[in-house]
Every structure is written in C-alpha cells, then in structure tokens.
Design a protein with these regions (language model features):
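Active-site neighborhoods and metal-handling regions in enzymes and metal-associated proteins
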Residues: 1-161
Length: 161
C-alpha cells in the first residue's frame, strides 16, 4: 500500500549472477569449511571398518566438525553403504557396513553461513569385476562432464570480460 504503483519484478537471474562472485571473506569461509571437512573425512575413513553403522560414522563427522569450529552441518551429512545408496535421497541408518561395501560419504561444515561439502565413495575391500567396471565408467563420465562444465564456465567468464 505504501507504493501502489510499484512493479514487482523477478530478479532471480541477477541474484544468481551476483552470488557467483565471492569476496575474500566469503572465500575464506569456504576454505575454512573445506579444511574442517577434510579433517572429518580423514577421521571417518580411519574409523570405517566392517561392523560399524552408517550413523556411527555420521556421529564421528559431527563430532569433528564441531570440535574444529563449524557452527553446524552445512548440508545434511550422510554415510551410506550398499542398499542405502540405491535411492537418490536416503538417510543414514543403523545399518552395519559390510566387508566389501562401497560407502558413500557426504560431509559438510557451515562457517558463517557458508556450507561447503565433499562427497566421495570409499570401497571397504578390493574393487573387482563388474563393480570396478561400473565405477570406472562413472568416473570417466563424471570427469568428462566436469571438464566440459569448467571449460564452458571459463569461456563464459572470458567473454564477459
């Protein structure tokens, strides 16, 4: 009612473009988050062994991020293995991790509102046969995708200069 002639305009594209540009302070927050996540990842991998549960591993990650100064989980953290990885959206459970399981880690740490995260697979045994072929295929596809995306971003950035 204060501005009866005001026009409401969507500015999603403007905000997305502005959010791509990070200040030195924002980059420092992201780096600190990644530093903490790296410590948490190392601790989870050290503790991973057959018989531990997915939730126990999440607990280790949570303990580490808080001990090292994170204000919260940046994104929901999870540790999935085998059957739990069949769904795009799942939850860590009291499922015990098995001897030859492939375990998916996704860990994050929020620093001053910035939420970097790292996701990676860990194999609990020797990766052989069809499983190795499948993982190799996925790595090649993802590597190609990421390299293509990076090239596109660089070209777009260069043309905007």
């Amino acid at each position: 009612a204060s501005y009866p002639k005001a026009e409401i305009v969507k500015c999603n594209d403007i905000m997305v473009d502005l959010r791509k540009i990070k200040s030195e302070n924002e980059i420092a927050c992201l780096r600190e988050g990644f530093r903490i996540i790296e410590i948490a990842t190392d601790e989870v991998i050290k503790a991973l062994k057959p018989g531990v549960t997915e939730l126990q591993m999440v607990g280790i990650a949570q303990k580490v991020i808080y001990e090292h100064g994170a204000e919260y989980e940046g994104l929901p953290m999870y540790v999935f293995s085998e059957a739990s990885t069949r769904h795009a959206i799942s939850r860590s459970r009291y499922r015990e991790i098995g001897k030859n399981d492939i375990v998916q880690l996704n860990l994050s740490a929020k620093i001053d509102g910035y939420s970097p995260s790292i996701g990676l697979p860990v194999c609990m045994g020797k990766l052989e046969g069809e499983r190795r072929d499948l993982i190799g295929y996925l790595v090649n596809r993802l590597t190609g995708y990421f390299l293509s995306t990076i090239r596109t971003m660089r070209n777009t950035h260069a043309s905007e200069q």
